Design a protein with these regions (language model features):
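Glycine-rich phosphate-binding loop of ATP-dependent small-molecule kinases
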Residues: 1-216
């Protein structure tokens, strides 16, 4: 099975992808992660990409497609793929169709995690983590048992991501909607788009996704 998970930053795509990997033995294909790994390993694609990024330019769709092509080859046909946050443009959607066809795979389902923008801002702006072990917390939803002390390691040092602010979140939401709008009709015409309430509790989101996949 091959699926696409769509949703803005903070919608929970990574969490749900990790659960699909655990439950179904699928492979999560995050283009950002693949790009960083390719650069670190100094593969031919990684070397080319690094040269482009060092010049302050965006990596081309062709390089991203080549990364996906290489990953699908390494995976083998028996392993399902989860495309996390990709494709992001109509051109990328067409290129993904081509590379899947090359590997004799079909796209089974596109799942969009729907979120309320104001609630998403609240969710992201309030989050922080332990500077020592990385345990995640939230100002409203998940405080440490002892205020100011990490539950897992006892550290008293915490940190927040600099881009976890309202302006950045709303800008990313606007960008996501602008880019995703032309992608969805590409897949809706095939009848493979499903939407899940991304603001529901994590376990409920997982259950909803599993129910959708069980239909395919």
């Amino acid at each position: 099975m091959n699926i696409i998970l769509l949703g803005p930053p903070g919608a929970g795509k990574g969490t749900q992808a990790a659960r699909l990997v655990e439950h179904h033995g699928m492979r999560q294909l995050s283009t950002g992660d693949m790009l960083r790994a390719s650069v670190a390993a100094q593969t031919p694609i990684g070397i080319e990409a690094k040269g482009i990024m060092d010049c302050g330019e965006l990596v081309s769709d062709e390089i991203v497609t080549a990364l996906i092509d290489a990953e699908l080859t390494a995976m083998g046909p028996e392993v399902g793929a989860i495309f996390d946050g990709y494709p992001r443009t109509a051109a990328q959607a067409r290129q993904l169709d081509a590379v899947l066809a090359k590997h004799e795979r079909k796209l089974d389902r596109v799942i969009e995690l729907d979120v309320d923008e104001d609630e998403l801002v609240r969710r992201i702006v309030g989050r922080y983590s332990c500077a020592n072990c990385g345990a995640g917390y939230h100002d409203e939803f998940q405080q440490p048992a002892t205020r100011g002390v990490c539950d897992k390691c006892g550290s008293i040092e915490f940190k927040r991501r600099p881009d976890d602010n309202e302006q950045t979140v709303r800008t990313r939401m606007a960008e996501y909607r602008a880019k995703t709008a032309p992608i969805l009709p590409h897949y809706e015409a095939r009848g493979i788009v499903s939407r899940v309430d991304g603001m529901a509790p994590i376990d409920q989101v997982t259950t909803a996704i599993e129910a959708i996949l069980a239909e395919d």
